[in-house]
Amino acid sequence: MDQDSIKKINFSISGWPGSGATTLALILANVFERECIYIGSIYRFLGTKMGFSDKGINRPQFDEYIEEIVGKTIDQFSDFKLLNENNLILDSDITAFRIGKHPKVFSIFLSPPLNTRKERMASKLEMEFVDERDKVLEKQYKQLWGVEYFNTDTINQKHNL
């Protein structure tokens, strides 16, 4: 495979809250000199503008509120970018659940145990609310897309790694 062909393949990086998906996406974007799109920044911006905290108890409440309003639009934007552009790394919770294993997208899903995720978030206020946030995301993704976000069999079916 030549260099031009490799640049046509995009990366989709996903993972459970606190898994390190954003960190991995930024590292890969730097190493492979690719544009990095962090979908979480859209939600963080909206949350700040609407008076929700990015961390702690407000985060699960905001996720539950905002997903129904803009979730599908943002998810469809993510799919469009991955399937129609080149040389991208996209960090989004559930993109590969929707597009599956696609020849244009190499998808990675990070699924560390809950204790590991809590350790990673130990310095953040949101650590104590990760269980609640997991439940909210699981419910919202199931309602919006029929995605079983914490089902490891589904994760393995839909992601390359």
Segments (PLM) and residue ranges:
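ATP-dependent small-molecule kinase phosphotransfer cores
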Residues: 39-100, 115, 126-131, 135-136
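Conserved phosphate-donor/acceptor-positioning beta-strand/loop module used by diverse small-molecule
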Residues: 102-124
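ATP-binding Walker
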Residues: 19
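Small-molecule kinase domains that catalyze NTP-dependent phosphoryl transfer to phosphate-bearing small molecules
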Residues: 127-161
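Hydrophobic anchor at the beta1->P-loop junction of P-loop NTPases
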Residues: 13
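Walker A/P-loop
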Residues: 22
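P-loop (Walker A) phosphate-binding loop of NTP-binding proteins
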Residues: 16
